[in-house]
Regions:
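Bacterial N-terminal signal peptides that target proteins for export
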Residues: 1-11
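Sec/Tat signal peptide C-region and signal peptidase I cleavage site
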Residues: 19-26
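N-terminal secretory/targeting leader peptides
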Residues: 27-116, 125, 129-332
Length: 332
């Protein structure tokens, strides 16, 4: 074969680059985030990335893709399950369709404080759910983000009672437990993909939604929502998952780094919530949002859900005994 001068120069350049390249180069993983930068998912992801780079002496790096750039949250579970995506941080309710027992953590009014959320996820309950997601979905939970209680927001009016809720069109995730909660409260919610939610609120397709204060702030929902009802029906927990196939392909050292970084990032996320939620709540008020407390300590909301919704999902979470034992572990 005869090489022209230009081809010879190009080939020489490639050889030079190959010779100059280090013997080992950093391994780069992709991490999907459903939320915008600045929220709980971003904080967990960036801390995990920093820790991984430190623990592996720079041999592992992570690229973060916020705002659903790599697909909606349920897509990321599916893609991780088949080895097309490395990591994802997502709302726990979007793991439930793939591993139903995880729905335990979204049973309305089960978790009543950040401390209880931490106790469940980092104790025996969390350990069992990790095993279940590996078995059911081929993804491994290696960390947890804590976002706080999902509060109700809307653009129409203050909501104190279930009567006030009637007539509002509320967006919910495509999650049977959450849909059933609103049905028990007397309305038919509108399931909508997370990536469509801001636009749906902006255009008036839906009147409201529910999410933690931190998420409301990060997604700038204050620009399209006026009223907040401080309900506490679900404590938002967002697991950090890794593809089990990809995890098993790694060396023992990298596996240990992933697990260790996940634990440390989890604790960081918990402290981030405790230190930032009140500040963020005040900032939302300063930006014009109005916070209303539900009437009578939320008793009507709680009664409807625990009587009508809990029994419907006993089987999927592992039985009524599973829920009873979880409540006992929390001292209730």
């Amino acid at each position: 074969m005869i090489l022209t001068n230009s081809k010879f120069i190009s080939l020489s350049a490639l050889i030079a680059v190959a010779i100059a390249a280090p013997v080992t180069s950093a391994k780069t993983f992709k991490m999907a985030l459903g939320d915008a930068a600045g929220g709980t998912q971003w904080e967990l992801g960036t801390k995990f990335s920093e820790l991984m780079e430190k623990k592996t002496n720079g041999s592992v790096k992570l690229d973060l893709f916020p705002n659903g750039q790599l697909g909606n949250e349920q897509d990321t579970v599916n893609n991780a399950a088949i080895g097309l995506l490395d990591f994802s941080v997502l709302a726990i309710n979007n793991v439930t369709p793939f591993s139903p027992s995880v729905g335990l953590l979204t049973m309305p009014y089960l978790i009543q404080s950040a401390e209880e959320a931490k106790k469940l996820t980092q104790g025996a309950v969390g350990d069992e759910l990790v095993k279940n997601t590996i078995r059911d979905a081929n993804v491994r939970i290696v960390g947890w983000a804590y976002s706080g209680f999902r509060v109700l927001t809307n653009s129409k009016r203050p909501v104190k009672t279930l009567e006030d809720l009637k007539g509002l069109v509320i967006r919910v995730p495509k999650n049977d437990i959450m849909i059933s909660a609103y049905q028990a409260w007397g309305i038919n919610p509108t399931p909508m993909a997370w990536s469509e939610t801001f636009t749906g609120l902006q255009q008036g397709v839906v009147d409201g939604q529910d999410n933690p204060y931190i998420t409301v702030h990060a997604m700038k929902f204050n620009e399209v929502q006026k009223y907040i009802t401080n309900i506490r029906y679900i404590f938002s927990i967002e697991p950090l998952i890794v593809s089990e196939s990809i995890f098993q392909e790694q060396s023992k050292d990298i596996q240990e780094a992933i697990l260790s970084a996940g634990k440390e990032a989890t604790e960081y996320s918990y402290q981030f919530l405790l230190e930032s939620e009140d500040r963020i709540r005040k900032d939302l008020v300063a930006k014009g949002m109005v916070i209303t407390e539900p009437a009578d300590g939320e008793k009507e909301w709680i009664s409807k859900v625990t009587k009508e919704v809990w029994p419907k999902f006993y089987a999927s979470i592992g039985g009524k005994e599973k829920l009873d034992n979880t409540l006992k572990s929390l001292g209730r």
